[in-house]
Amino acid sequence: MTMKTKRIASLLLAVAMLVLPVLPAFAAEEDSYTYVALGDSITTGVGLKDTHFSTTAKSYDVQENYHDYSKDCYVARVADALGLDRDHAVNYGMPAAMSSNILDLVRTGSTASGVAYYDLPTLRQELADADLITLLIGSNDTVLQLMGAMGRATNGKATKLLIPLLTGTMRELNLQTLQTLKKGLENLDLTPEELKAALKLLDSGMEEICDQTRGQTVANVEQILQELRTLNPDAQIILVGYYNPLPFLPTYGRHFRLLNRSVKALAQQYGADYVSIPYTSIANDGHPTVCGHKYIARQILKAVRK
């Protein structure tokens, strides 16, 4: 071996010695990429096969679903596309959660009040360590207010019908669903006063509820984004917009158009990426179908920077 050849070999060996220790570090860094999904029952995957949740005295038990969620939900599809296993992609979808509940969770790790009570002591640290965070929250703010108002207008009679509709019991549009719905409507047995109050609510009352809740939803989403940025200045945050879960109600269409416009502006303000999902395919219960989840995942993946 000539002196020149020896020098070249020595140089290559030195470079190899410098590079080789770095390669495992890159692999470890790749392995440590984590995704945390925050949201309500849409994120949970309610209505999909193999979604794990059950009712409890206080709320819903979804602990098993944090990691063992349906392969058809948008969280799974995003995780799979990014090559993440279930230890690196966590589904914190909370059935019945409102924006105020998620705000409590990111601030303290538990929900202070509301329909849904959840306790996630490790959440804040997981958010601080995450590389990607998706947030889809706010639809329930208006839906639950509407349910409450309809229950009061009908002295609780309508609630018995609304709960099965919204929890997936009558998810599929088939003969059995139509028969169940027909029977439920017949059994309402509303008095003339209750019927008048219900119709008034569906007419002008709903618009009032939407206008009242929209401002609070926007304020809560802004505070969630502030808290996420404080916890993790470097993570990519994707703020997912809203589809109309009740397309047969025109007032809701206007409400979600205005809400999308507001949260899109918030995303820009806090360095987040806004994703629009207006064409989500939904079932009778207002939750996305398998195709709907595919669509949401595609929209999110278009925005992911990995």
Label each PLM-derived region with a short phrase.
Residues 264, 284-306:
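Histidine-centered active-site loop/cap adjacent to the catalytic His
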Residues 19-31:
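Sec-dependent signal peptide cleavage junction
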Residues 29-69:
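Short glycine-rich His-centered loop
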Residues 215-219, 227, 244-276:
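Substrate-gating cap/lid alpha-helix
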Residues 197-218, 246-252, 285:
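Surface-exposed cleft-lining segments at the edges of enzyme active sites
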Residues 54-189, 196-203, 207, 211:
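Conserved SGNH/GDSL esterase-like catalytic core that processes O-acyl groups on lipids
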Residues 34-39, 43-45, 88-93, 131-136, ...:
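Structural recognition of the beta-strand scaffold that forms the well-ordered cores
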